[in-house]
């Protein structure tokens, strides 16, 4: 019998646009793990899980979402900076909103600059227009490794749930892990180290994160974290953020209440 499966992880930061004639032009930036459900919550009001700032002001359209964040924390930090550009030392060059500038236009201007400065410039993000009729050219344009997409996000692949392991199974798995070695340095790999594996079929690469980072950085001297590189085993191109995200999916993690994280902490102050 096959084991149960769960959807793959999705962390997105989105931009809502208000279509209510009384509030038309208002926008809202938020974090979600499920875009379709999240926009329904916003339109249903705070009692149904929507945010305080959007409750009673709908209908709202989710017009843009960025996804591909390696973790919920990375997405939440991006969300906060997009909401509060004046408080981010990375965005001091952007400048405040102009008196003649629409809120939507201002938020796109902030976003364009965010995608061009550290630490966000090196994330494996996709900029996705859920409403193509709202599309604006970002200036400056996103980095070449960040594609522009249209329409709803593709379904997330199902990841098999790990069955509960007996003590004997756990000991056997630890013993096997102790015998595995890093492709690059030949030292032993332990399960808790979360070795990086090449996603291409048939590629035998298993490496310490530090070892593979150093290998990739040979192609990007002067950088602290790699953006991309070529697999030392199969020679195919790999995005660093995708590798790290896959590593996190394949390891046991602490349970995180993502539903609570979807409502920004500032909304919780409005009681």
UniProtKB/Swiss-Prot annotation:
GO CC terms of this entry: Slx1-Slx4 complex
Keyword annotations of the record: DNA damage, DNA recombination, DNA repair, Endonuclease, Hydrolase, Metal-binding, Nuclease, Nucleus, Zinc, Zinc-finger
GO molecular function: 5'-flap endonuclease activity; crossover junction DNA endonuclease activity; zinc ion binding
Domain named GIY-YIG: residues: 9-94
Location(s) in or outside the cell: Nucleus
EC number(s) reported in the record: 3.1.-.-
Pfam family, one: GIY-YIG
Main location: nucleus
HAMAP family: Endonuc_su_Slx1
Family: Belongs to the SLX1 family.
Job description of the protein: Catalytic subunit of the SLX1-SLX4 structure-specific endonuclease that resolves DNA secondary structures generated during DNA repair and recombination. Has endonuclease activity towards branched DNA substrates, introducing single-strand cuts in duplex DNA close to junctions with ss-DNA. Has a preference for 5'-flap structures, and promotes symmetrical cleavage of static and migrating Holliday junctions (HJs). Resolves HJs by generating two pairs of ligatable, nicked duplex products.
Protein name: Structure-specific endonuclease subunit SLX1
